[in-house]
Structures are given as C-alpha cells and as structure tokens.
C-alpha cells in the first residue's frame, strides 16, 4: 500500500478542466456541464460511471480517510484552516471543488508552501495550474504555418469520443 510507503504524504485531488467544461462542485464531478453519470462518459462501453461523488468513488479503492474542501471554502473561506481541520480529523486524501483556473491556482498557491509533501493528482486543470505556479503564465506561441498535410490514423478503441476524434 502506498500509504505504508509514504506515511507522511497527503493526496490533494483537483479534478477540473475549465476549458472543457469539466469541474467538481460539492464533491460531484461534472463533464461538459453534465453530472458524470449523465455525461458523455455514460456511454463508455467498458466502465460507464454510476456515481458522481468523488469521495465515494475513491473510497472503493482505499481505506484511507477522504475529505472534501467545498467550493465555498475554495472561493472565500479559510482554505488553509479547512485543510488543517480535515487533516486533524485523519483525512489523508482531500478532494477540492474547483470550477475555474483561478480556483485551481488559489488552491495550489495557498497550500503548496504549507504542505510540501503532497501527491497532487487530478486532470488537465491541475496540470495547467501546476505549470503556471511553477513556471509562470502561459506564453503565446507564434502562429503555425498552414500546411497541406494528409494523415492516416488507426484506433482500436470502442469509445465514442475516439470515433469522434478520428472523424474530425
């Protein structure tokens, strides 16, 4: 178990991708504005989601205590105090509500200096937030040259999204 190998580390989960309409609100995952079980992932041929509450989803795979820091705290509450309170209660995994890039950056900027021993996990929004925190704001790229290029792609996936990507 990872908790045995890294007993002094915490897990902070921020699962959002603001550019794609994916966010976490009161612990529930939304994709393209739809709650997870009704989102495009509901058509997943292998593992369609049955629930949306991230702490419950995570609890199926761990015995560690899981806490939630809700959007009210992220946007205007005592974020550091709320996290300390959850940790004092024995939570080793904390799920953070996050809707916007600003939410993600606020969480990282507030907590990274206080908690250096954290496994940050999440999705594209977290990756973007960590990159900006560590390296500064994204720098615009010069426009790419337009080229006439043909492409052949293969995909061995039953996922509807993969079919749409290939059709594009």
Regions of interest found by a model, annotated:
Residues 27-29, 74, 110-112, 134-136:
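Generic preference for flexible, low-structure residues
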Residues 1:
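Extracellular interaction modules
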Residues 60, 109, 132:
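Short, well-ordered alpha-helices that flank and scaffold nucleotide-derived cofactor binding pockets
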Residues 4-6, 110-113:
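Short, surface-exposed basic-aromatic patches at helix termini and helix-loop junctions that form
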């Amino acid at each position: 178990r990872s908790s045995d190998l890294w007993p002094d580390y915490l897990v902070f989960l921020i699962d959002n991708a603001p550019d794609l309409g994916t966010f976490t609100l009161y612990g529930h995952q939304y994709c393209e504005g739809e709650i997870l079980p009704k989102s495009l992932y509901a058509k997943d041929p292998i593992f369609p989601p049955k629930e949306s509450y991230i702490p419950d989803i995570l609890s199926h795979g761990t015995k560690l205590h899981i806490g939630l820091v809700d959007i009210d705290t992220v946007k205007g509450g005592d974020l550091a105090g709320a996290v300390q309170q959850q940790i004092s209660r024995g939570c080793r995994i904390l799920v953070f509500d996050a809707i916007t890039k600003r939410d993600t950056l606020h969480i990282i900027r507030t907590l990274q200096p206080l908690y250096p021993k954290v496994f940050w996990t999440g999705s594209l929004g977290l990756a973007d937030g960590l990159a900006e925190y560590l390296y500064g704001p994204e720098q615009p790229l010069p426009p790419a040259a337009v080229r006439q290029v043909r492409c052949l792609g293969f995909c061995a996936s039953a996922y509807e999204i993969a079919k749409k990507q290939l059709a594009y």
